Amino acid sequence: MSSGVNSTGSAAAAPEVDKMFFCYQCNQTVTISISSSADPFCPICNQGFLEEYEDPNPNQSLNFNPNSSDSFFPMADPFSTLLPLIFGSSAAAPSGMDFMSLFGPSMQPQARSTQQNPQSDAFDPFTFLQNHLQTLRSSGTHFEFVIENHPSDPGNRMPGNFGDYFFGPGLEQLIQQLAENDPNRYGTPPASKSAIDALPTVKVTKDMLKSEMNQCAVCMDEFEDGSDVKQMPCKHVFHQDCLLPWLELHNSCPVCRFELPTDDPDYENRSQGSQGSGDGQGSVEGQQTPRFSIQLPWPFRRQDGSGSGSGAPGTGGGNLETRGEDLD
């Protein structure tokens, strides 16, 4: 029977294994060779403020050493092939593939530092992002991710798992930009006075009372037969006292988010630009959906901090290019 004592009678040294950690002092991922009995220390700053990445596949060797050719998968237009799996698209996606499969659902941090104690009910950023993005998509929001790239550097490689990069400061940046660009954060601008004045007043009919339009969607009170209501171009009707105060703050229909013209020229230009064609004047055919861009640095960081893709254009190892992937 084998034992943990060698022929000289001393205890056998525990084998060292390569494990991946996120260093909060250096703000980057590092690979450390440690034994099960040793405390990990960052090889760059020699500090112990680390969190271990849990291996989602124990049978697969993960090597995230940036000096190794096996550390990252080759860059092969990942955003056009992988990001639609996050948000959904007209193209069919493999069953079960979603946000979590791309950003790494099992790559949850496992605290190994004595300076940090995990909590069982800790905030799960990956679940939060998935739910948030799905909510935005359900309202018809279009996303465009703009990636700062170093095309002249042949060493550019995509991480095997985006969660390896977006955990830590990269994840905070992603959440911050999503929150700042959330179309529901500030809402749409007020409708123009001319558009409000042009809304017709119609009489409530018995047929209307028998339909789904038998109540005001703002106050939820049922309409009375023969009463006057305001009608939006999308045909939804509301009490005048309910609709007009809303349109003085937002140009969108409270039910379907159809948008009336505004007096904000910047907003109108953005709406017409995202449409690409059409009059953009609030017709049903020209109805706009929210659209915003998220700018992220190239998700690759060398341990010496170079090649991060976060510098200014024309500096460092080559010119930065901005490339966008529109997720319709």
Curated annotation (Swiss-Prot):
UniProt record, GO biological process: protein ubiquitination
Top-level taxon in the UniProt lineage: Eukaryota
Keyword Zinc-finger on entry: yes
Organism the protein comes from: Arabidopsis thaliana (Mouse-ear cress)
N-acetylserine found at: S2
Protein name in the entry: E3 ubiquitin-protein ligase RING1-like
UniProt GO MF annotations: ubiquitin protein ligase activity; zinc ion binding
Stated role: E3 ubiquitin-protein ligase which accepts ubiquitin from an E2 ubiquitin-conjugating enzyme in the form of a thioester and then directly transfers the ubiquitin to targeted substrates. Promotes polyubiquitination of target proteins.
Zinc finger residue ranges, RING-type: 216-257
Keyword Metal-binding among UniProt keywords: yes
Classification via InterPro entries: RNF126-like_zinc-ribbon (IPR039525), Znf_RING (IPR001841), Znf_RING/FYVE/PHD (IPR013083)
Entry EC number(s): 2.3.2.27
Feature: compositional bias, Gly residues: 306-319
